[in-house]
């Protein structure tokens, strides 16, 4: 069996890794060992923060809905309870967008929720 020297594949792998580490400061973009650790950590941060982003946006939507609801004399929890009882199935993302872009329509939704509560 012929002897396989891995020089070509190692260079290919290192090149791919250093390409991923492009833009990092100092030796993190030049040294393979340091670049590997940095890229692995960056990928882990990306994985973690894709999940955290969902939490953060939900929190932001709730804050916006609560602020807009209080301008109409209603708390967030009472508004959500009223919407559920009224059978209005708008999610938090849509409600928050409505509160920011179309306050009049949001006001009408709040009125419907107030009638039920």
Swiss-Prot record:
SUPFAM superfamilies in the record, alphabetically?
Answer: Ribosomal protein L20
Q: Which UniProt keywords apply?
A: Ribonucleoprotein, Ribosomal protein, RNA-binding, rRNA-binding
Q: Which Gene3D superfamilies match?
A: 6.10.160.10, Ribosomal protein L20
Q: Which residues form a coiled coil?
A: none
Q: Mind telling me which InterPro entries this protein's record contains?
A: Ribosomal_bL20, RIBOSOMAL_L20_CS, Ribosomal_protein_bL20_C
Q: What's in the GO CC field?
A: ribonucleoprotein complex; ribosome
What GO MF terms are annotated? rRNA binding; structural constituent of ribosome
* GO biological process terms on file: ribosomal large subunit assembly; translation
Q: What does this protein do?
A: Binds directly to 23S ribosomal RNA and is necessary for the in vitro assembly process of the 50S ribosomal subunit. It is not involved in the protein synthesizing functions of that subunit.
Instruction: List, alphabetically, the PANTHER family matched.
Output: 39S RIBOSOMAL PROTEIN L20
The record's section on NCBIfam families has: rplT_bact
Q: Which family does it belong to?
A: Belongs to the bacterial ribosomal protein bL20 family.
Q: What is this protein called?
A: Large ribosomal subunit protein bL20
Organism encoding this protein:
Roseiflexus castenholzii (strain DSM 13941 / HLO8)
């Amino acid at each position: 069996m012929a002897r396989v020297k891995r020089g070509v594949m190692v260079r290919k792998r290192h090149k791919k890794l250093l390409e991923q580490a492009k833009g990092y400061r100092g030796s993190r973009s030049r040294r393979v060992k340091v670049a590997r650790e940095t890229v692995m950590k960056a990928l882990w941060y990306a994985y973690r923060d894709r999940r955290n982003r969902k939490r953060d946006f939900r929190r932001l939507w709730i804050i916006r809905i609560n602020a807009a609801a209080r301008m109409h004399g209603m708390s967030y929890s009472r508004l959500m309870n009223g919407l559920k009882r009224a059978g209005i199935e708008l999610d938090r993302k849509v409600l928050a967008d409505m509160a920011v872009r179309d306050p009049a329509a949001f006001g009408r939704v709040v009125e419907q929720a107030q009638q039920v509560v």
